[in-house]
Amino acid sequence: MIHRERMRDHFVTLVRIDSPSRQERALAMHLAEELHHLGAEVSFDEADRLVGGTVGNLVARIRGTRAGAAPFLLCAHMDTVGADVGIRPRVEGDVVSSDGTTILGADDKSGIAIICEVLRVLREEAIPHGELEIVFTICEEIGLLGARHLDVAQLHARTGLILDSSNPGHLITRAPAANRLQFTVRGLEAHAGVSPEKGINAIRIASEAVAAMRLGRLDDETTANIGTIEGGTAINIVPNTVTVHGETRSHDEAKLKIQTEHMVRCFEEAAARHLLSLDGVIHRGQVHCQVHRDYDRLFIPEGARIVQLVREAARALGREIALWQTGGGSDANILCAKGLEVANLGTGQREVHTVREHLVLSDMVRSAELVLETLRLQAA
C-alpha cells in the first residue's frame, strides 16, 4: 500500500533541494542515490552538454520480476520553473504549500515523489512487475529540452506514464502543438524632442502590430499570446529596435498555421505603413520574423494500450478516469513524437508557476495508487 506520510516527507525533502532549469545536479545526485538503494541501475545522458546545464537526464532501469511482462516507462522532470530557490514548504492538513514568497515545486517534484513511492512499495511487497525504466528529465520548463535531447532508442519501454499534471482523475491524451515567434522590429533613431519627424518609432510599429492581432483564446482548440516586449534606450530617443516574443498553440495544425501567419502578417503590415523620406532617401520600418516549432501535438487514441491499462486500473480501484485535453505541453508531446505511447497523469499539483502553488496530498495518494495498480496489471 502507498505510505502517505512517507511520500509526503519525501516530497518535502525534494522541494528543499534547489533545482531551477539547468541547475538540477544536486537533485539528480540525490535521486540517483535513492534509486540505487531501490535496486536500479542509474545513468545520465549528455543532454546537459547540449543545453548548457549541470547534469543530463537521469535514466534508471529496474529489472522485471515477471517474465514476459512488457517494459514500462515512468517519467517526471527535475527542474522547477523560474529562478526561485530556498523554498520553504509548509504542511497544513491535506495541503503542502510554500511560505508564499516562492513557488512550491510540486511541478514536478510531486511526480518524482510518486514514482519513488511506487518503486518502494513494489520492492517491499514483492509485487510482480515488468522491467521499469525511470526517466527524470532536465530543462522541461524552458522548452522541454531534456526530453527533446533524450535518445529513446536506448529505452526498452514503448509505453508509459508521465506524472506532470493536476487531477489524478484525468489522463491527458491530447495536448496542442505550439509555435514560438520572435519579431525584431527596426525603425530609425532620432532625437525625440528636436527632430522626432526624422525618426521611425519601432515601439509604435510593434504596438500597432500587437493591437491588430487576434490574441487569447481563439476557439476551443487554439490560443495565442504576446509575452514580452523589449526595446528602446531612453525617453528622449525615438527607438529604432524592439524585440517581441509570442506564441500560438492549437490542437489543429491548419489552425496553428493560420494563426502563425496572421501574427507574422500583422507585423509585416504595421512595418510597411511606416516610411519617410529623409534627404532624398526613403526609410521604411522593417521586421524580421522567426518562427520556431516548440513541440508537436499530443494525440493518443482511445484504444491505445496505455489508455486501456489506466482505465482498467481505475476500475480495479473503483474509480473513473477521464480522457482529457489540455492547453499545455509536456514531455509527453516530445516522447510521443519520438514514437512512444506516453500519457500524462495528474499528481495533485495546483496553481503551478505561481507563489500560490500547492499540492493536495490526498490527490497525490490517489495518483500513486493508480500508478501502482497500472504496473500490477501491466505484469498480469
Which residues does each PLM region occupy?
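Metal-dependent amide/peptide-bond hydrolase catalytic core
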Residues: 202-380
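Glycine/charged-rich beta-loop-alpha catalytic/anionic-binding loops adjacent to active sites
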Residues: 90-103, 186-190, 317-318, 349-353
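N-terminal capping segment at the start of a domain
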Residues: 1-25, 293, 350-354
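Acidic, glycine-rich active-site loops and adjacent beta-strand->loop/helix elements
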Residues: 48-50, 78-80, 135-143, 165-167, ...
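Acidic-glycine-rich active-site phosphate/pyrophosphate-binding loop
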Residues: 79-94, 172-184, 311-312, 343
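Active-site metal-coordination/substrate-binding segment of hydrolases
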Residues: 53-57, 61, 68-136, 157, ...
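Acidic/histidine-rich catalytic neighborhood of metal-dependent amide-processing enzymes
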Residues: 100-176, 218, 224, 235-236, ...
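A non-catalytic alpha/beta surface segment that caps or lines the substrate-entry region
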Residues: 20-67
